[in-house]
Amino acid sequence: MLQVPGDVQILKEDNVTHSFCGLASVGWMYQKIRDSFFLILGTHTCAHFLQNALGMMIFAKPRFGIALIEEGDLSKNEPTLDEVIAEIKADHNPSVIFLLSSCTPEVMKVDFKGLADHLSTQQTPVLFVPASGLVYNFTQAEDSVLHALVPYCPVAPAGEKSVVFLGSVNDATADDLRAEAEELGIKVGGFLPESRFDRMPAIGPDTILAPIQPYLSRVAVKLERERGSRTLHSLFPFGPDGTRVFWEDLAREFGIEVDLRDREKAAWEKISRQTAMLKGKKVFLTADTMMELPLGRFLRSAGAEVVECSSAYINKKFLAKELKALEGVRVVEQPNFHRQLEDIKRLRPDLVVTSLMTANPFVGHGFIVKWSMEFMLMPIHGWSGVITLANLFVSPLDRRSKLPAFDKAVWLEGVMPAAE
């Protein structure tokens, strides 16, 4: 049992991370950095995973690809990728190439950093991104991408105070965040990442880093150490409560006092139908995206009973305010999934937020399920994302209320008795 400031107790268990591989981050990162190419050194398993997970056919010529490791490569000191890189440059003309690791070459002890340095040129740098599922879950790989981009962020001079938002969001959400900051009188230095490689924000000793995703602690620490920047430790801008606190805390960093309680009240009123459905509902969050703590905090504020809020990894300093807001909730790091399964059977929550891997088994047991990955892919940040966020939670409850009673026999038809 771990103790954190504010008497929040975190139960740490010993399970493996039930999460997508870090390579899944390619799905949103290549779309965000439009002049990039993501190259994965991996196996046929990696290729099948990406094609199925991202739903991308090869003739679409997406800006990501896999250099396959074959049996013959096992006897080589290092894989040779010069021809692959030349082909990528000819077909896509990227400004930057990200070289991602995967499990098999990690086990083979491939020197990815040396390989990236060898392939890199001044015109087209090749940046190593550790993303192996042996070490990282799929959201942490975004942290690795931003980590690799830090040397390409210009150094902002001392005295030039501005905010840089950390985290990949779509352009509409980025525009909303920028407009809100400027309306409050906060100077915006940019976003890490920006949509183009040559537009990465200048970061210096008077830059305030405002993380908008809860899994970017490593890049924040790197910027603090190397640039002297300061990280905003606040709630994340999910839901009316988190968005209000986020903007009030950020404004305070710039010497601006704002009171956004009326704005928060209006946002809650917009989702009154959704909160009425959530009120009193028991919700269980299993570990997957590392977004679980702010999502659990929003659910609690919306009137739901959060039975358990678990996450693969919990950085206690980075998430201190979220943890404080969850006082009294069972918070678990690296949860034991078998224990969770038994607890869920016993507690019978009204909604289980879980990974794609475990969703169907829970449905088979008669539970209402929400895929946690959907929160990664939808615009749920800030004031503009409040309705989308609330709808993500209530949509499965809505759907179940319109369906006939669950027929377990349909799921088990033709299955051997031992499988029940």
UniProtKB/Swiss-Prot annotation:
It comes from the Bacteria. GO terms for molecular function: 4 iron, 4 sulfur cluster binding; ATP binding; metal ion binding; oxidoreductase activity, acting on iron-sulfur proteins as donors; oxidoreductase activity, acting on the CH-CH group of donors, iron-sulfur protein as acceptor. Signal peptide: none annotated. Keywords: 4Fe-4S, ATP-binding, Bacteriochlorophyll biosynthesis, Chlorophyll biosynthesis, Iron, Iron-sulfur, Metal-binding, Nucleotide-binding, Oxidoreductase, Photosynthesis. The keyword Flavoprotein does not apply. InterPro entries: LIPOR_BchN/ChlN, Nase/OxRdtase_comp1, Protochl_reductN. [4Fe-4S] cluster binds at C21, C46, C103. It holds the Pfam family Oxidored_nitro. Binds 1 [4Fe-4S] cluster per heterodimer. The cluster is bound at the heterodimer interface by residues from both subunits. It is an enzyme of class 1 (oxidoreductase). Component of the dark-operative protochlorophyllide reductase (DPOR) that uses Mg-ATP and reduced ferredoxin to reduce ring D of protochlorophyllide (Pchlide) to form chlorophyllide a (Chlide). This reaction is light-independent. The NB-protein (BchN-BchB) is the catalytic component of the complex. This is Light-independent protochlorophyllide reductase subunit N. It comes from Chlorobium luteolum (strain DSM 273 / BCRC 81028 / 2530) (Pelodictyon luteolum). The gene is bchN.
